Design a protein with these regions (language model features):
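P-loop NTPase motor domains
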Residues: 1-180
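P-loop NTPase motor core of the ASCE superfamily
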Residues: 5-6, 100, 106-107, 169-173, ...
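Structural recognition of the beta-strand scaffold that forms the well-ordered cores
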Residues: 110, 182-184, 212-213
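Histidine- and/or cysteine-centered catalytic micro-motif in compact active-site loops
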Residues: 114, 159, 187-189, 216
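Sensor-1/coupling segment of RecA-like P-loop NTPase cores
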Residues: 175-195
Length: 226
């Protein structure tokens, strides 16, 4: 996956110019696997110049036994199968959403998710992971005091439905320093512990200065608020 990401991200046309973003999208990785096959991908990677970022990860992939490589490709294809949905492919084909806008202009972004179907949870997880990162970068690079000009409030209702956020325990710990505030809303502590196991959920809860409990129906939540 890493090798193909680097390959697609840095792909160029015949004149050596990078392809448009719409042709360097995540859905193209699925196309490479289903339309080209592993043998053609081998040839394409071999033609890349020395030092290309795709060569290193692909070299590690080639160290696996041949039958294992096939299983890796099949597994990757299954995980990327969601990109057969044209709407998902189109949504990830460009970067029209300004992730830094909330930090310097009053606005509101709404992410409407299904609480029952987790098929597209990776998209919401990616969105929130990226917006935390971009706002942090904006505060560090574009402001004198390292703080966002406009405070950004994240109301994370049905938090587990968002999908697991990469290194969220770190994000929620540093956000206030950049004028970002998180309101984490869950139906039970057990939900949070299931999504962020091994005491990670406790670190997240510890970063919340205030806790409001509207009622509990499980022992784990009851013990936490008692």
């Amino acid at each position: 996956m890493t090798a193909l990401l680097y390959y697609v991200q840095n792909d160029t046309d015949g004149a050596g110019h990078r392809l448009p973003l719409s042709q360097r999208r995540l859905g193209r990785i699925l196309s490479l696997l289903t339309e080209n096959g592993l043998s053609k991908i081998d040839r394409e990677i071999n033609l890349l110049p020395a030092g290309h970022p795709a060569k290193g990860p692909y070299g590690l992939f080639l160290q696996a036994k041949e039958n294992l490589r096939g299983n890796i490709v099949i597994g990757l294809g299954k995980r990327l199968n969601v990109f057969q949905d044209k709407l998902v492919d189109a949504l990830t084909a460009d970067s029209s959403i300004d992730l830094t806008l909330p930090g310097h202009k009053p606005c509101a972004y709404f992410c409407i998710l299904s609480a029952q179907d987790s098929t597209y949870a990776f998209l919401s997880s990616l969105f929130f992971t990226m917006i935390f990162s971009r706002l942090e970068q904006y505060a560090r690079r574009e402001t004198e005091d390292g703080k966002l000009p406009i405070p950004v409030n994240f109301v994370l209702d049905e938090f587990p439905s968002i999908g697991k956020l990469g290194d969220f325990k770190r994000s929620i710990a540093f956000t206030r320093g950049f004028r970002m505030n998180c309101i984490v809303i869950v139906q039970s502590i057990a939900q949070l512990a299931d999504m962020y196991p091994r005491h990670e959920w406790e670190e997240i809860a510890a970063c919340c200065d205030a806790t409001i409990c509207l009622g509990v129906n499980d022992l784990t939540s009851a013990k936490f608020v008692s």
